[in-house]
From Swiss-Prot:
Record bears the keyword Cytoplasm: yes
Domain UVR: 215-250
Record text on subunit structure and interactions: Interacts with UvrB in an incision complex.
Residue ranges annotated for the GIY-YIG domain, each copy included: 28-105
Name of the protein in its database record: UvrABC system protein C
Transmembrane stretches, start-end: none
Name of the encoding gene: uvrC
CDD domains for the chain: GIY-YIG_UvrC_Cho
Cell membrane listed as a keyword: no
HAMAP family: UvrC
One of the GO biological process terms: SOS response
UniProt keyword terms in alphabetical order: Cytoplasm, DNA damage, DNA excision, DNA repair, Excision nuclease, SOS response
Domain of life the protein comes from: Bacteria
Subcellular location: Cytoplasm
Length: 623
């Protein structure tokens, strides 16, 4: 990859003239180009087999209104040459996600998806939910469309196969069965109530079920149930019946389970009125692991082929593609996309646009889902627009806010204090922009809510002024909502003045005298408190915003508290991370036992070198 930017034009020309000026020295190599406006903001990122030929297209008239606007705004360009067009495609999608150009199709929600992991770093395998890099030893099944889908499947698998989900440290410390054994969700291998061989057989059955051999597993359980019934072992027969029902429940929640599709993602696109919905169904081992809808940002005159190609490039930028992608719409550069995805996966990846048969039926079903999801979203968007207009009227704003930030704190008598910020706008809650703040102030009095809010807003505005001083990146709020009354509003106003931020409206939302929903009072600097009518839709909207901020802050606080509860002296030893901590606790059972271990015992733990063993030993034995 090489930066080959021709010298910028001397005069501040824009549009067609600017592009023609760059063409004079541009090479015919493959690569990526960027179009920038007069403020050097990236307008568009594109790839090309031949940069000179591709950019010359922009120098000729006859483009769509969207592209014409982009050309008029173009004041400069940047170029990167690559060895191959495939490399250019991968770089293009990476830059689009990073720079979020104004005129590109942009996938806005791009989280990783959870898997089920059968962890095999212990003699009794653990079954659990896993998200992120696949570094742990074991077998992975997925991806699943959501954490809820994983949790439901895990719940039923525990009923069917009685596998443990506890951590190794908890497993080693048990002296009697836990509650999961009592409710028939675990076979209690921790206290020896099942043999190694029987537990391994249960793990194997669970893996067979998740690998698509579910029918055979159920048939074997049914045979065992009949044999137990004939032997008049009715309690065992009933237990086997319940296990079969649990597996049937898993299959029932999966909807369609295609027989002729072993490993594929079904990707269906619906475009309407300048908006798009992409439905992705995840099919692995002939089983449907759920579906997710995505709403990429598109222009009013963009084609289905362009949206589909951009979606595939960005979606699989940080995910391993399956063996087949079954698409609703063909893309222009299908061969190039196939080559890029195959290179990423390290094996062949097929792109299919089926016209008949089972695969076409899958696409048809996904398209129906996409149409219905987009219709709901457009309806909700219209309602949201109306509510934002009502909010502007209620608080005397210049116009409907496009970005609302809501803040709340959570703590227990000042301990594990956190602040939470949620963001909402015309498209609803923008969860990928939520932020949490661990309260750092050592000089704060425990429970000082005013001081905590001051710290949170100080950090927020300090960062905003650093990252977006010109307010042109869409990071600044149009409205701040604070959970609290006059005192909170005064504290936040003080912070805003200190940072020179005087033009952002701020409202404190305080519960009324009886602290009841519907009796909220609203506080603004220099104004008397006021209320909205109990049946005002805007009031319900504000309550939803406040409750979401409260939920997020409490959830963050609970996670921090849980982490603090599980903290041990091992956390303070340099070189002992999460994996080595787990290994030490699994080997010794507790941090106290680790502190008593000698060097020979410590080096016997997997992943602990002689040098690290010495550090651990010295940590516990220094005077």
């Amino acid at each position: 990859m090489q930066d080959t930017n021709p010298s910028q034009p001397d005069s501040p020309i824009t549009g067609y003239a600017c592009i023609q000026d760059y063409l004079r020295n541009l090479s015919g190599a493959p690569g990526v180009y960027r179009m920038l406006d007069a403020q050097a903001r990236v307008l568009y990122v594109g790839k090309a087999r031949n940069l000179k030929a591709r950019v010359s297209n922009y120098a000729r008239p006859g483009h769509s209104p969207r592209i014409e606007r982009m050309i008029r705004e173009t004041a400069s360009m940047m170029f990167l040459t690559t060895r191959t067009e495939t490399e250019a495609l991968l770089l293009e999608q990476n830059l689009i996600k990073q720079l979020k150009p104004k005129y590109n199709v942009l996938l806005r929600d791009d989280k990783s998806f959870p898997n089920i992991l059968v962890a095999k770093d212990h003699s009794f395998a653990q079954i659990k939910k896993h998200r992120g890099a696949k570094k742990e030893k074991g077998t992975y099944f997925g991806p699943f469309a959501s954490a809820g889908a994983v949790n439901r499947t895990l719940n039923q698998l525990q009923k069917a196969f009685l596998l443990r989900n506890c951590t190794d440290a908890v497993f080693e410390s048990r002296t009697r069965p836990c509650l999961l054994y009592q409710i028939k969700r675990c076979s209690a291998p921790c206290v020896g109530l099942i043999s190694d061989q029987d537990y391994a057989a249960a793990v194997k059955d669970a893996e067979r079920f998740l690998s698509g051999r579910s029918t055979r597993v159920q048939e074997e359980l049914a045979e065992q149930m009949m044999a137990a019934s004939e032997a008049m072992e009715f309690e065992r027969a009933a237990a086997l019946r319940d296990r079969i029902r649990a597996l049937t429940t898993v299959q029932g929640t999966q909807g369609i389970n295609p027989r002729g599709v072993a490993e594929a993602d079904v990707v269906a696109l619906h475009l309407e009125n300048g908006q798009a919905c992409v439905q992705v169904f995840f099919i692995r081992a002939n089983q449907n692991w759920g579906n997710r809808d995505f709403y990429p940002r598109v222009g009013e005159d963009v084609s289905a082929a362009e949206v589909m190609e951009a979606f595939l490039g960005q979606f699989y930028d940080n995910k391993e593609p399956p063996r087949q992608l079954i698409l609703s719409d063909a893309i222009e550069n299908a061969d190039l996309m196939t080559e890029a995805l195959s290179e990423k996966a390290g094996r062949k990846v097929e792109l299919l646009v089926p016209q008949r048969g089972e695969k076409a039926e899958l696409v048809s079903g996904a398209l129906r889902n996409a149409r219905e999801s987009l219709a709901r979203r457009m309806s909700e968007s219209a309602t949201q627009t109306k509510l934002l207009g009502g909010l502007a009227e209620a608080f005397d704003l210049d116009g409907p806010p496009q970005r609302i930030e809501v803040y709340d704190n959570s703590h227990i008598q000042g301990t594990n204090a956190v602040g939470g910020m949620i963001v909402a706008g015309p498209e609803g809650f923008l969860k990928n922009q939520y932020r949490k703040f661990n309260i750092r102030g050592d000089d704060l009095t425990p429970g000082d809510d005013f001081g905590m809010m001051k710290e949170v807003l100080t950090r927020r505005f300090t960062r905003l002024l650093k990252e977006d001083p010109d307010r042109d990146k869409g990071l600044w709020p149009d409205l701040l909502l604070i959970d609290g009354g006059a005192g909170q509003v005064s504290a936040v106003h003080e912070i805003m003045m200190a940072h020179g931020v005087q033009d952002i409206p701020m409202v404190g939302v305080a519960k009324g005298i009886d602290r009841d929903h519907g009796k909220e009072e609203f506080h603004r600097t220099g104004q008397r408190p006021f209320a909205l009518k109990r049946n005002d839709p805007v009031l319900y909207f504000i309550q939803r915003l406040r409750d979401e901020a409260h939920r997020f802050a409490i959830g963050t606080h609970r996670a921090k508290r849980a982490k603090a509860v599980s903290a041990t002296p091992l956390d303070d030893i340099p070189g002992v991370g999460a994996a080595r901590k787990r290994a030490l606790l699994a080997h010794f059972g507790s941090a106290k036992a680790v502190s008593r271990a000698d060097l020979a015992d410590l080096t016997a733990v997997e992943g602990v070198s002689a040098g690290l063993a010495q550090k651990i030993y010295d940590f516990f034995h220094e005077s």
